[in-house]
Amino acid sequence: DQLPESEAEIYACLAKDKYQIESSSIFMDKTSTNTSENIKNAIQIFNDHTIKHETMILIQDPILQKRSYVTALDMFNDRQKIINYAPIIPKLNSDGTIENDTPYLWEGTRLYELALGEVYRLRDDENGYGPKGKGFLRHVDIPEEVNRSFEIIADKMPEYLARCQ
């Protein structure tokens, strides 16, 4: 068997193999390259197949969850409900490792890149995705402790920010 190429295909394989969901019940967006496109394309798939979508359960990598939710809020109308659910919340130890009992997809460098990249994007400044920056997101309040941690890590390990700049 060939490995799936897109994230959508990976989830489809999981749905079929682990949960016995029929292929005919799975609709995939294999073309999006960002969160906004993914949500827009999902809405189009719902409309194309006349699938009611008054309620959406948003399940995402927990590091990407907040930005995905904020993006979805601006793409759905007030009559639609978004249930924001992170199935896994990784617990970070003081030494930077993830607790063993927390199954998680990312390790080491990639985890730090994702975490720093999300704070970078959520910020409402000239570099972020908020109204004062690129304008992709509404303003998001980031706790001061998170901002301080971001600054410390970004200052000591600037290579982790390289992917988002």
Language-model region placement:
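A conserved mid-domain beta-alpha-beta active-site/ligand-binding segment of alpha/beta enzyme cores
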Residues: 92-156
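A structural signal for short, hydrophobic/glycine-enriched beta-strand patches
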Residues: 1-110, 160-165
